[in-house]
């Protein structure tokens, strides 16, 4: 417990919260270029081949980003949009691709939760 005199001299410092997505630098999204597109395996107890990409952002950061949805058209030098949001079973993956913007196409034949995957509404006739 500090004395009154110590508080007068120093004061109390408020704890600053650390950002969970520092590469965005307080922006909602960031643009970047894919430097490598590959698959990786998740932590135990899960098993899959998760699609991820290493992305060089416009601010110079190089981050690993998850490509959500079934199938994608990304390759090296694709220009992509990154948002925050980690993938719990992939260590080091703290960002998501925004589907349906820039070079990233939306998920084909998606009927539900379309806005999350950049899918257009299906025609009424089909």
From Swiss-Prot:
Biased composition regions of type Basic residues, renumbered to the chain: 113-126
Gene Ontology molecular-function annotations: rRNA binding; structural constituent of ribosome; tRNA binding
GO cellular component: small ribosomal subunit
Entry superkingdom: Bacteria
Spans annotated as Disordered: 1-27, 103-126
Residues with 3-methylthioaspartic acid modification: 89
Subunit text: Part of the 30S ribosomal subunit. Contacts proteins S8 and S17. May interact with IF1 in the 30S initiation complex.
Family indicated by similarity: Belongs to the universal ribosomal protein uS12 family.
HAMAP family (alphabetical): Ribosomal_uS12_B (MF_00403_B)
Identification of the protein by name: Small ribosomal subunit protein uS12
Organism: Paraburkholderia phymatum (strain DSM 17167 / CIP 108236 / LMG 21445 / STM815) (Burkholderia phymatum)
Organismal lineage: Bacteria, Pseudomonadati, Pseudomonadota, Betaproteobacteria, Burkholderiales
């Amino acid at each position: 417990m500090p004395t009154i005199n110590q508080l007068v001299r120093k004061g109390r410092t408020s704890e600053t919260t650390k950002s969970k997505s520092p590469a965005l630098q307080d922006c909602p999204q960031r643009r970047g270029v894919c430097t490598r597109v590959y698959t990786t395996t998740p932590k135990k107890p899960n098993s899959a081949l998760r699609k991820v990409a290493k992305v060089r952002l416009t601010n110079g950061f190089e981050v690993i980003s998850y490509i959500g949805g079934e199938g994608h058209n990304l390759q090296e030098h694709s220009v992509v949009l990154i948002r925050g949001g980690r993938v719990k079973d992939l260590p080091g993956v703290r960002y998501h691709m925004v589907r349906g913007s820039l070079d990233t196409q939306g998920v084909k034949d998606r009927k539900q939760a379309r806005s999350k995957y950049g899918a257009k509404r299906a025609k009424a006739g089909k």
